[in-house]
């Protein structure tokens, strides 16, 4: 939903820099022989030659359009050179283009606040740079103006008959009677032209730009004169730009809102909105949206340049059109594994290079039912807390898909059964990681994010579970079907400052394009138990004991820890009888000392504190597996998997002293 923001009172200078057919330029730099030839970059897709994602200007002159497929492009322009996007994991690999885009951003960011909007476009706030230039070297004082500056297109610029275009631009820029707004724009024209020249020199890429007083107008202007040119929108020319602009061309009006304006109010251009009062628009679309519509009709936008060089999210997706649509859960899982692997690599790179970690994993998909024209309902998106590591992301992505599938098919009154999707087809899959935050300073090693460290999630003041939470999605049963609190990115000594909540899949926003705050909600669960570990050495053999104590704090932990967390980080070898007797003797002696003497407070208090925990050990062979049947299915699977692992690990490592310690008391008795 659009958000109405008041425009800054002071004049701003905002530029939108857009690379010219960027993918083609990247390939031309790699293969210089393609320069000057009609060429295009095609997606990885064998069907009809693949879809075009970038078309050179030479190919456009031959009638080739980006909406075409490779075979169509060759029919329209037989001499066209088609270059396929690099492939990895059976899908397009865009890392080459991302890296090239980063080269451009590193150059543009030197001029002021910079916001990377996509692989090939950037917003710049040049207000400070323009004000400095206006104070030190105003345009009217310049004797020489660069040729690139004089090529600028200035909307609303008056030209006398017979005047040279470049001379008219010079006169507009150097006006002494211009108001402050226009003088700042003149400085912006000079700054942007120099930046574009620098980008061309260092990267061999051309770019176009729009220069205006806000992001909205700059974005509209950047595409008006391509390639390798820049367009300026002075304040006086705003209405000229917007009066004839189709309503669907305006950002955020290309969907349902724009359609509603056309059908309900008869609005075809942005200028048509001027006939409606702010109150009238608010009556139709609410206070916030109504005010936003009233503002954009007048070229008003207070949206700030965010000063962000790094992406807000990472994603990986693939479409399966026509006969390539997925027909079984196994093929869906295969492709989710591929997408998750790519996403994991990008997250790991971001973590290593930028010290950032993502908080939320989201799955999007599209589906339809063959021979059913009424089946094109939106496939619900699902989100859960982010866990790092390829296997974990793959597992969570598939669980999210299954939850979404149950909800989607449930809307038709159908329950999914078996591996086959029957008449259903999946035509698109994507996984994304969002809500990315910086890692707090003082973190000893980022590799901790890839290590499983079982910690009990704590609860913040607002009741949210803190820490990365592993979970298995359920559509109909909500969070209670399967739950785990294995923390995958825990750093005990550092608070990451990120709060996560377990998702409730029954109350999720189904907007595929956004991960909203309501996508992830808190799930009630049982009180957690704090498990502490002690270790000591005896007769050259290191053993570990498990201490179990209740937390007396007023703030109780939430979340149901996996039962395997209690066992998996401890040595399964029980303490010897001698050790147990020695511990018991020390415990009793320390208690008696506490009651009989106060002269040794320091030593005795320490011993009493140690004796408050009841020590116990266990031996995996003594666990009665018949009691497993009384446990939830999820815990049964975890325990059996754990015991198999420990049995292999401990083979041949018995002490041979016959000492045993039972854990049977941990389980309720089995009624036979």
UniProtKB/Swiss-Prot annotation:
What EC number is given for this enzyme? Answer: 2.7.7.7
Q: Where is the composition biased (Polar residues)?
A: 523-544, 570-586
Give the GO terms filed under biological process for this record: DNA replication; error-prone translesion synthesis; response to UV-B; UV protection
Summarize what the entry records about the temperature dependence of activity.
Answer: Optimum temperature is 22 degrees Celsius.
Q: Does the keyword RNA-binding apply?
A: no
One GO cellular component term, please give it.
nucleus
Cofactor, how bound (note): Binds 2 Mg(2+). Prefers Mg(2+), but can also use Mn(2+). In vitro, can also utilize other divalent cations such as Ca(2+).
Name of this chain's protein: DNA polymerase eta
Which species is the source of this protein? Arabidopsis thaliana (Mouse-ear cress)
Its organism's taxonomic lineage begins at: Eukaryota, Viridiplantae, Streptophyta, Embryophyta, Tracheophyta
